[in-house]
Amino acid sequence: MRAVGVRGGAWLGGVNAWGDVFVDGQERLRWFVAADDRWYRPSRETTVRQREISGVPVVETRIKVPGGDAVQRVYGVADLGGAIVVEIYNDSTLPFAVAFDRGDIATMREPSPTGVQGIDLPAGSVVFPVGHHATMRAALLIGDRERNAGLNAGRKISAQQLESLPSFEQVERGWLAALHVTSRVDVPEASWSNILTTQRCKLLLTGGGGGDSGDRGDDFVALILDRAERVKLGDRPGEWVDEVARAAEQVLQRCAKRGSTSWLDERAILSAGMLLHRAGEVRGQQDVERAWSRLLGSRVAETASARADGEINSVGREAVEKYSGVRQIAWVESQLVAQRHDGVIEICPRGIDAGWRGANFECHRLVASTEHLISFAVRWHGEKPALLWEVEGPAGACVAASAIDREFFSSEMRGETLLAGFTVEQSALVK
């Protein structure tokens, strides 16, 4: 099931593998196509293909029909109190008809007076002709349903109102603009960028916040990562301060009891400090940093000149599929930047994979410390990578790329340099 909806909505839509539309887990609308040769039931067709356009909650489902495809696009809009728009596009050389299994939906024109013929559908089903390269639009009105059983069945909107709703291209651009405020990566491993897009859209679709703060340590980590991502996406940090501070305390206590830290613990503490900093909770931020420093033997407080002694907990090359949700975002970003225990910002802390040699790549606005963001690009000059970087935040940040060039170290907020190359042999990425 692929999710559709609006940012922070009180409802959540979904589209199953063949294009049936759901609202809050209940099936609301099915579609069927009458082509030149026969009726097509999407749930029984072997030619169904589906994708999320640009990775955002705009779901496109295609079915092969004579001369091309019948295309369904489903997405949520906030207009009219909330609606799920269903567009049927005839991407074929022949006309066809589309049927819906309910008639109490908003449509751009009246259904065919002949009704549905040649297929057994529920009473009240409606059918519409769709010409060559034409589009038929319908909508399920959500509105202020107050979680009742009906779906605004008695509410009607005009064809003009339906036509004025945003197109799928506009909704796609809106989602991408919402994501543009946080970190972005353009790297040879394309799935990493897709992960950031998909997981962040899932966050934006839910308004109450995920990350159950139960009794398990992983729940506290997930809560912190969830709230930090929401802040990076534009939420006000103040509303999350208390629960993030409590969750950070639980993570610290667990690490102390266990006598070790994991990379997820480090990302959680970094994220908690970032959120507290953005909320203006300087004392809380400093308390977390001091507690973390004590836990690590005060190595966080070491100066940059002692960078050779800095350490980063290894993520290794575990497949990202081992994780889910916000942990996947943390995994991707930790492959590209990390803060050492001595405070130095490490670019590509696990090195550059051998499979990336010769491929230029860049990353934007990655969280590098509680107070800093970093953007960087790698451009190849023969066998050597040139590094360009820019740090946002207060002066005093130090940058290194020890897994690529052990000699490189800079206290400049922006700059460029030609790195020596690989200091360790990198294996192929686990995808």
Tell what function each PLM region has.
Residues R173-L295:
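Substrate-binding groove/exosite segments of carbohydrate-active enzymes
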Residues E146, E229-D235, A256, G280, ...:
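Hydrophobic/aromatic-lined pockets within catalytic cores
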Residues M1-T197, C201, A306-K431:
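Terminal accessory carbohydrate-recognition/targeting modules of carbohydrate-active enzymes
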Residues S213-G214, E249, R258-A279, S298, ...:
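Carbohydrate-binding/catalytic loop surfaces
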